[in-house]
A protein has these predicted regions:
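N-terminal subdomain of nucleotide-sugar transferases
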Residues: 1-61, 252-258
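Conserved catalytic-core segment of nucleotide-activated headgroup transferases in glycan assembly
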Residues: 22, 209-279, 291-296, 301
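Membrane-proximal helix-turn-helix segments that form the acceptor-binding/catalytic region
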Residues: 25, 98-105, 139, 151-184
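A short, active-site helix/loop in glycosyltransferases that binds the activated sugar's phosphate group
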Residues: 121-123, 164-203, 275-278, 395
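Acidic donor-binding loop of glycosyltransferase active sites
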Residues: 301-315, 326-328
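Short hydrophobic beta-strand element within catalytic cores of glycosyltransferases
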Residues: 319-322, 329-333
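Conserved acidic donor-binding segment of nucleotide-sugar-dependent glycosyltransferases
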Residues: 346-355, 363-368
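A charged, aromatic-enriched C-terminal amphipathic alpha-helix characteristic of glycosyltransferases
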Residues: 366-399
Length: 400
């Protein structure tokens, strides 16, 4: 079987300048006998050398497409306000030039695969083919959840932006193609349900998110001593702000500091955490701040536990999946752990309040082996239910 894959970003083993990790890991362990040609706008700006490396790793041919002239001028002349007057999100209006459509058809693919919510318009250029549209999230659900979280709406402008984007994505997703020969692929169970509610005739399928890179040599789970290493991964932004602020306030409470300082050291991996790092260091905690690392997985593996204070979001949280797959115990909110096959108090720790978070942080040093076993069970669950080969096979079955 031959598949033509059309994507805004070039696949890469990590998220590099966009959601490049997901398609990479859907392809890297795909079944034998499936040929893939990739047509990418390379919005993540991978170098030619990097693209050639990806071609070898994924056993694919990558064609880099030029950005549409209209978009080039909109950006150059700072005319992005135009999107306000459009019925759908601006990316929906991208179409492949006729010569590229003919090039793809001339390569005789058996099916067309499109990536990203806004590429539904491009997939309409191939109506006669079997098509799979990897959305992968229901973006109207994203904006709907934002509207329900007042702390993310810091100004009238933010509120207005959420309302406008919710309406645009709702309209676009309501009008997704519902033909018999196209399937929408999502990585969130609630995303798939919400999309079907918007567009009852759509064939929408929920598949688990594959895990990303793991070390070639898997070590047994053993927490560090004398201090257990905690990790908070990701930028300090509105998706983590509320719960992260509460977490730092909890750590800074004088009633908790004496106990927690002695048993934990903390790393913030991502931008925007300077204020929290400075505050905790001043209080006597051992805190490190890494804004960027060239080898994300290697850095993750230096830690024992990942704290995931995610307040709002959709789909599957890739950084949480990375931590679980690499043997870290994840302590996270329901939003952090949604769509991941782990069970609270068995293979992860899910918390709903600051009191629950504090209780588990106090409990871990007294029951280290129990929590190490929990982390190991989390890793095992990810290998089984989120294995790349398993998920890739499920995806490729959609093209049949």
């Amino acid at each position: 079987m031959k598949i033509a894959f059309i994507t805004p970003v070039t696949p890469y083993k990590e998220n590099m300048g966009g959601p490049s990790g997901h398609p990479y890991h859907l392809l890297v362990e795909r079944p034998q006998g499936i040929e893939v040609e990739i047509y990418s706008y390379n919005a993540n700006k991978l170098s030619l050398e990097t693209i050639e490396g990806v071609e070898r790793e994924l056993r694919v041919k990558i064609h880099v497409l030029k950005q549409p002239v209209s978009f080039t001028w909109i950006l150059r002349l700072h005319l992005t306000f135009i999107r306000f007057f459009l019925k759908y999100p601006i990316g929906y209006y991208i179409r492949l030039p006729k010569c590229t459509v003919e090039q793809i058809k001339a390569s005789s693919p058996n099916a067309i695969w499109g990536y990203g919510q806004e590429f539904s318009g491009i997939l309409k250029q191939f109506k006669e083919y079997k098509r799979v549209h990897t959305v992968p999230d229901c973006y109207s659900l994203h904006w709907f959840r934002r509207l329900g979280c007042r702390f993310t709406l810091t100004s009238v402008r933010d509120f207005f932006r959420c309302v406008v984007n919710y309406r645009k994505y709702y309209r676009m997703e309501r009008d997704y193609d519902t033909s018999d020969n196209i399937t929408a692929h999502l990585v969130g169970e609630e995303d798939a349900r919400f999309l079907k509610e918007i567009n009852p005739s759509i064939n929408a399928v929920f598949l688990r998110h594959p895990h990303y890179e793991i070390p070639k040599k898997i070590k047994s789970t053993k927490f560090s001593s004398p201090k257990i290493k905690l990790l908070v991964a990701g930028r300090y932004d509105l998706y983590m702000k509320e719960k992260a602020d509460e977490m730092v306030k909890l750590l800074a409470n004088k009633d908790n500091m004496g106990r927690l300082q002695c048993v934990y050291m903390l790393t913030f991996l991502g931008k925007g955490w300077e204020q929290h790092v400075e505050k905790l260091n001043a209080l006597g905690y051992e805190v490190d701040h890494i804004k960027f690392t060239p080898d994300y997985i290697k850095e993750v593996c230096r830690h024992d536990i990942q704290l995931a204070p995610i307040t709002v979001g959709t789909g599957t949280k890739g950084k949480v999946l990375d931590a679980l797959a690499n043997g870290l115990l994840v302590i996270g909110t329901p939003f952090a752990l949604e769509n991941i096959v782990v069970e609270n108090a068995v293979s992860c720790v899910e918390y709903h309040s600051n009191e629950e978070l504090l209780a588990v942080l106090r409990d871990i040093p007294d029951k280290v082996e129990v929590y190490e076993q929990m982390a190991e069970k989390g890793r095992e669950a990810i290998f089984v239910e989120h294995g790349r080969r398993h998920i890739s096979q499920q995806l490729m079955d959609l093209f049949k």
